[in-house]
């Protein structure tokens, strides 16, 4: 109860297929982006793109709460830096931090949607596989502060070169 199901699509699944089941299992609403999955149930909401809608909702939620956010990125060391930063800040503040390494275009919005008015600061880990990824996550998150752990040559395939990695991490 109180949950919203977003019919996200993956390489091997189409979340739209599970919308009705999600409602049966207790979700309050199901967001779909294919008209074939809309029924007479008013709790099914048709949008142009479920992922974009999830990201927009997370951005809106972040703006409403308006608390400080620290964004963390880098070639490696993101998760450790996030955990250490969260542990230090938790000595004085009620902190929300990204769980594990859920640091992509889906994990970051889901983390932001966990923010409540009781939180005083958020630590958001941001990962990238391709140029533009960090820019997209920054637009959703609008961090007040940023930490770049380091920039290295790991995972060059998505960036083309070390310069591509550097450019992406500085987005």
Q: Language model features by range: what are they?
A:
Residues 53-171:
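Phosphate-binding loop of NTP-binding sites
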């Amino acid at each position: 109860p109180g949950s919203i199901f977003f019919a996200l699509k993956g390489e091997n699944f189409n979340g739209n297929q599970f919308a009705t089941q999600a409602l049966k299992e207790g979700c309050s609403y199901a967001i779909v982006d294919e008209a074939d999955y809309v029924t007479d149930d008013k709790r099914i909401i048709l949008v142009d793109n479920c992922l974009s809608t999830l990201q927009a909702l997370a951005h809106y939620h972040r703006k409403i709460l308006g608390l400080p956010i620290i964004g963390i990125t880098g070639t490696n060391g993101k998760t450790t830096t996030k955990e250490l930063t969260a542990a230090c800040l938790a000595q004085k503040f009620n902190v929300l931090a990204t769980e594990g390494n859920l640091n992509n275009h889906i994990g970051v919005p889901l983390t932001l949607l966990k923010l409540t008015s009781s939180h005083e600061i958020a630590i958001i880990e941001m990962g990238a596989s391709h140029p533009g990824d960090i820019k997209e996550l920054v637009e959703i998150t609008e961090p007040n502060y940023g930490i770049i752990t380091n920039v290295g040559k790991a995972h060059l395939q998505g960036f083309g070169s070390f310069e591509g990695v550097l450019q992406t991490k500085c987005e």
